[in-house]
């Protein structure tokens, strides 16, 4: 049988339907309030106030206390999630992150603006300096009970990362950012879900799943 080299393989597929998290997952700075809701098969979390990931640029501060639920991977991979975020304060955010260190990482998420329009954004941090890009949130907000619903995909290809967004897991997927992280392509990478509330508390996040995939390896 011929092996399809383009078919991805699951490194992790957490549907948040069990009593505990997949043992491959671990927290960096867990929020005070989080739990698995088996009734809706999602991870619920409420980011603590004054939490963020940012390094120096323009604003002159460093923050590395955001909430990050990750698995460790090596080599090329793709992380995908579906998020429903109920924000309360400006810059409330939830999405995906890939991280090598406090000074080398990428994150992508919704970014709430109470006076609108809200954003989908990406922050790329190299050598301790962050670079922020964003676009207007392209999907309907505050419909059917409120919140912002969206899917995100973060692909690692060597040193390069591609950020994509979609209204649903089936797509269509839209490219939002292509960036390089100054890191060893063989270095262990932490990749997974993150959430922050840089100002006040009250934001609620539902993560429907976290899937991390890698390309099929050549048979030996």
Regions from the language model: what does each represent?
Residues 2-220:
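Extracellular glycan-recognition regions
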């Amino acid at each position: 049988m011929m092996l399809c080299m383009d078919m991805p393989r699951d490194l992790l597929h957490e549907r948040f339907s069990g009593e505990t998290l997949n043992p491959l997952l671990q927290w960096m700075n867990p929020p005070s309030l989080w739990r698995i809701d088996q009734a809706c098969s999602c991870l619920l979390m409420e980011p603590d106030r004054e939490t963020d990931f940012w390094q120096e640029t323009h604003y002159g501060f460093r923050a590395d206390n955001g909430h990050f639920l990750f698995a460790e991977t090596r080599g090329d991979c793709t992380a995908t999630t579906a998020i429903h975020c109920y924000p309360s304060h400006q810059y409330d955010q939830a999405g995906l992150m890939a991280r090598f260190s406090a000074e080398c990482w990428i994150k992508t998420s919704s970014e709430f603006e109470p006076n609108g329009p809200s954003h989908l954004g990406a922050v790329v941090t190299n050598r301790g300096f962050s670079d922020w890009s964003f676009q207007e949130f392209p999907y309907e907000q505050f419909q059917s009970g409120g919140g912002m619903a969206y899917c995100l995909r973060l692909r690692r290809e060597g040193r390069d990362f591609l950020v994509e967004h979609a209204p649903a897991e089936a797509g269509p997927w839209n490219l939002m950012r292509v960036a390089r992280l100054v890191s060893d392509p063989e270095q262990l990478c932490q990749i997974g879900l993150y959430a922050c509330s840089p100002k006040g508390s009250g934001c609620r996040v539902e993560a429907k799943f976290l899937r991390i995939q890698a390309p099929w390896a050549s048979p030996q």
